[in-house]
């Protein structure tokens, strides 16, 4: 898909972070922009930002929607058609949440919340929008589906189980949709970034009341530590530009990178993830050490060229604590166990 002007884009999770960056980028290309989010205050602020970015107010539609509720998501799709005269030509599903902790400490609520937003909302959107898009645009004009996944789709850790499982499923869904949509003149792209400058570090604040029973240690101090990491993530508009290039060039997997060397090291590491699970633990540890050294060397070279990834500073110990640990009252958990250990 290369011709964006005058067409319609819908971005789930478009009120902040990566989603808002995508809305800005494609709105700047002349698209009519619809964004969906669960928070009205965030939507109101996003509309102001989009207008300030140069997108005409008449080309902006902000919809408060629970993306995990199929009836509500269908209502959202209906509103887009009623407002702009058709379904989106470009569907970008970006809404996501995360919660970190030992997977053996996880509760049903931890899985239901993370999988519900990160996977089920994507399924909902595909099943609601794609039939409409095919009927309206197949063999007539360009259309495309995209989803924001994560590097976590390729490499799970003991503290990211629900999130990594959801993102791995999303990736495979998009591979399937790319194959399925080819006969209709369309395709799919899955964006797999690392750290993004976004509000996902605040996600726990907006966790539904009926899914609050977590097995992880979560409080304002742990969230502050997480926010410190996301504060130095890739700029959402820059990430949106990377996604646009991937869509224009029909890339199925989009891996944002800072330098070619970092990208090459990243790809080799991903290939090793699959290969390593067939090896002994000692062999895996040896390869992991080599990969860390290679990544460190690539990062040092990037720093010399002025293209290094930004560093971050942890908050002070007085007002923060490590995230990714289990609740203290779970007596089957090793109390010293930390994220990905």
Where does each model-flagged region fall?
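Canonical Rossmann dinucleotide-binding motif of NAD(H)/NADP(H)-dependent dehydrogenases/reductases
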Residues: 2-34
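Active-site helix of classical SDR
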Residues: 126, 166
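SDR active-site lid
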Residues: 179-259
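The beta1-alpha1 cofactor-binding region of Rossmann-like NAD(H)/NADP(H)-dependent oxidoreductases
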Residues: 40-41, 64-75, 108
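Residue(s) in the substrate-gating loop at a strand-loop-helix junction
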Residues: 150
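Active-site-adjacent segment of SDR/Rossmann-fold oxidoreductases
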Residues: 29, 155, 176-186
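Substrate-binding pocket helix/loop in short-chain dehydrogenase/reductase
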Residues: 102-103, 107-115
